[in-house]
């Protein structure tokens, strides 16, 4: 099969979740004999035309001077144009929809017959509170257009799958994100942050309102753990919401904003040795950092929503508000005694059985073959 990954910011990954996904899946598919191309913006530091057998197609992107939002529309448009007009792909995998819809309409993707265009719908983007009212309306329109113009949809979370079925009557294929079990934790990484094993809490997220950082912080501050074990907040603080959080909570003795941590071993070690891990993401789908926390054997306390429950199932305790966070922390020793081993063991098994990258390569290969069978038997 000839397969393309479009609307990713290149591989090897130096950007985010879709890029890590594209790297693992594309390399895995190449090892199985498929011809895979990943589109990459011109500003990506990796300039070779091949990576571990994957063809890299470099496309000019003005994002560095035009800005990420506007520039990404241009980059995605030119990438899809190349994939449709100059190549002969069997499958074009579209990673998200928020900057590709004008290209979908321009190229009349729904009537394309040469290639099968399948779109990963990501989360409920129009619910992201970082967008103002008008942007959310535009993104909601984009969602409808993605459903209309894509040949097939992919959902990385069963909550997302159910949403599209109920709202649009459209089926989507559940194909999750992945993670690998970690086994090289290094307690020495704690020293850099003045931490001790199981004597701190951790939250890892983009500092955006929909990730409910305020809920976790307020719950912590009103608990008996405030000042006893610090709450470590990992994430860039240069977002508007991040700046608000630092201004409001930065002087609290128990709350520490440490910025982003991009050394994977360091981050997973700090996750692993925590007393508990807060996961507040609430707009879906399957968040990569949640899978990484599961793979790192974290004791996870999660915001109560359908997306987190779809992944964690019975291997977490859930909080709908700050008061519940306070209640949990006030009883943390009993909670850990009752649940920690069962929850962490259960999450590790879930990663092995459902979210390992090798398993996901199997699933994607099988699904892409099925798509071609549908095409040739129509």
Question: Predicted segment positions?
Answer:
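N-terminal strand-loop element at the rim of the active site
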Residues: 8-14, 28-67, 159-165, 236-240
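Short hydrophobic beta-strand element within catalytic cores of glycosyltransferases
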Residues: 295, 299-302
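Membrane-proximal helix-turn-helix segments that form the acceptor-binding/catalytic region
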Residues: 81, 135-153
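An aromatic- and histidine-rich active-site surface loop
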Residues: 71-84, 89-122, 285
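Glycosyltransferase donor-sugar binding loop
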Residues: 44, 179, 204, 229-243, ...
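Acidic donor-binding loop of glycosyltransferase active sites
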Residues: 269-285, 298
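Conserved donor-binding/catalytic core segment of Leloir-type glycosyltransferases
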Residues: 4, 194-222, 232
């Amino acid at each position: 099969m000839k397969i393309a990954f479009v609307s990713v910011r290149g591989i090897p990954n130096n950007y985010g979740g879709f890029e890590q996904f594209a790297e693992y899946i594309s390399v895995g598919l190449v090892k199985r004999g498929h011809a895979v191309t990943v589109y990459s913006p011109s500003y990506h530091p990796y300039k070779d035309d091949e990576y571990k057998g994957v063809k890299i197609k470099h496309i000019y992107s003005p994002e560095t001077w035009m800005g990420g939002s506007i520039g990404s529309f241009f980059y995605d448009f030119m990438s899809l144009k190349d994939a449709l007009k100059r190549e002969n792909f069997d499958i074009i995998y579209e990673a998200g929809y928020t900057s590709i819809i004008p290209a979908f309409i321009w190229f009349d993707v729904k009537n394309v017959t040469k290639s099968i265009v399948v779109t990963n719908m990501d989360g409920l983007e129009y619910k992201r509170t970082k967008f103002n009212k008008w942007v959310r309306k535009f993104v909601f329109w984009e969602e409808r257009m993605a459903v209309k113009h894509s040949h097939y949809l992919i959902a990385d979370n069963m909550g997302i799958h159910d949403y599209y079925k109920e709202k649009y009557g459209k089926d989507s294929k559940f194909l999750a994100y992945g993670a690998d079990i970690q086994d090289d934790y290094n307690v020495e990484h704690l020293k850099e942050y003045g931490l001790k094993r199981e004597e701190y809490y951790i939250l890892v997220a983009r500092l955006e309102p929909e990730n409910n950082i305020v809920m976790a912080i307020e719950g912590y501050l009103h608990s008996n753990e405030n000042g006893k074990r610090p709450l470590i907040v990992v994430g860039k603080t240069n977002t508007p919401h991040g700046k608000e959080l630092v201004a409001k909570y930065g002087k609290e003795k128990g709350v520490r904003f440490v910025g982003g941590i991009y050394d994977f071993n360091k981050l997973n070690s700090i996750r692993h040795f925590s007393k508990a891990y807060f996961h507040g993401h609430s707009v879906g789908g399957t968040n990569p950092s949640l899978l990484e926390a599961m793979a790192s054997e974290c004791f996870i306390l999660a915001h109560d929503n359908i997306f987190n429950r779809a992944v964690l199932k019975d291997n977490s305790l859930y909080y709908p508000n700050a008061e519940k966070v306070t209640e949990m922390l006030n009883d943390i020793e009993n909670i850990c005694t009752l649940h920690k081993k069962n929850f962490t063991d259960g999450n590790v098994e879930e990663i092995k059985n459902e979210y390992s990258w090798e398993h996901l390569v199997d699933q994607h290969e099988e699904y892409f073959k099925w798509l071609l069978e549908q095409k040739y038997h129509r």
